[in-house]
């Protein structure tokens, strides 16, 4: 997993480059290591486009998210780092490895953050890189 940085204006793939540097100049650790076991209370960081760098803990793994209308996404990691609209796709990591990618958050009816953010594990991203990006269970 890596970040993509836009090198120059343009519509073609060659206008982007892979980088491990965050917009604040900080560098992500160890260029691509990932973990497969997600213990509770494991400290993680996320760097979202809206929220910037946030720190929190894994609260639960293998979480299903109900989007309504019978659409349920499975296998996410629930974390308590703060995230907001516009943070989707952010890297989630600890001090030595990538954990996943910011994929969703819980919000109150007034639009305020409800205390939980959801990351798609790196193991799912790499296993499904040639398949559809999201997988759904419909009832």
Question: What function would you assign to each model-found segment?
Answer:
Residues 84-87:
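Short, small/polar residue-rich loop motifs at catalytic or cofactor-binding pockets
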